[in-house]
Amino acid sequence: MISQSNTNNPISDNSSSRGLIPAPIVRSLRCPACQLHLSQDAHRLHCVNGHSFDRAKQGHVSLRLGGRTPLNADSSAMVVAREALLDTGLYGPIRNRSRELIASHAPSTSAPLVADLAGGTGYYLSGILDALPGSFGICIDLSAYALRRAAKCHPRSAAIGADLRDPLPLSTQSVSVAASFFGPRNIPEMQRVLRDDGILAIVTPTGQHLVELVDALGMLRVHELKDQRLAAKLSNFTPLVRERLTYQVAISRDQARNIASMGPSAHHMTPNQLDARVHQLPPHTDVTVSVNLGIYRQIRASRVVHA
């Protein structure tokens, strides 16, 4: 919650050992109300104009301002389902290949900053940070339930609440890696916060992703023009890597239920409806996991200048 405060007590770089947001991350944050840099004290983030943002007891901080109609943030049940599904390792190959590609193309700089947008529980961010020694990471998400988990996903990370429709609460050219896994994207803002040598990492589902469950469980389909729409939005970026990762795996009914419960399809069915559909599945179902992975760098001439 935003409030007025006259606090002005910045902390030293040993903040992570004291349970606070690591100082290199704080230096990249900016106030969503006035766009000035933020400082940190024992309980909150604040700017010199007196805007103050409390840190939740679980460790995350919301830098979201009011005024917009709220989106459907992930509920507690959705986050529990996602965490249970990810713990099985079903999406492990996506996590592993993504961090390999990112580590191969990330700029060589001291203490690079990684921003995972709509990062959920921090599952993918923690893998990236392990692959980039000395890096720091920010998981940005709208769901407080996801942020509670993301705040503890890695000792060099922080969890920040924000609406991706708004300007990101990050300084211009402060980010070395901007990542998006299955989530919504604000490409102009990602371009603004990226360093000139920074990279954009995007993972999106293909039309074959979980196709065996789409009809059986009434899940949402991937739009047939999804790839073309993304390409149009990335006109100011050049692709460094574009590849498809596809594999098949046998899943249980519980895993199928968690898959349907953890994403946007959960907003379009009741738990009872889902249980009835899952009950019709065999004990194990072979499903296809299929995603497009892309690494991009912005075209220098397209750099947008911001005051």
Predicted regions and their residues:
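Conserved Class I S-adenosyl-L-methionine
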Residues: 26-27, 244-307
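Class I SAM-dependent methyltransferase Rossmann-like catalytic core
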Residues: 68-97
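Class I SAM-dependent methyltransferase SAM/SAH-binding core
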Residues: 113-116, 120-167
